[in-house]
Amino acid sequence: MNRKNIFLEYVWLDGYETPNLRSKTKVVKVWDGNFPIWNFDGSSTRQAPGNDSECLLNPVRSYTWSNNHYIVLCEVLKSDGSPHESNSRASLRQLESNFKDEKYWWGFEQEYFLKKDGIPLG
């Protein structure tokens, strides 16, 4: 039986002042459909010192890229499982829990500037 490799691409924000996207890919032949917590060296992403560099990637959302490739969005945890300082999702969860009885909504906004020919700049 010829099995395709399954690619699980874990994506997270690093610890730089202006965060960058980072990723690493796990290739598996047998997959149970779950996205396990995975570790990475946080010293290379400004998320841990060199002498204690293990950080954890906690999957929070996944998207199918193709029939055998998944994008796995992650939040960063410290090696003890607590939220890392760069983990803005944890801050948002805390804020949301303070207002759980309120009716609120939030969203993202992206602005564009159009040239005279109707093409976005950049």
Please name every model-derived segment:
Residues M1-G122:
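Glycine-rich, acidic/polar active-site loops that bind/position phosphate-bearing ligands
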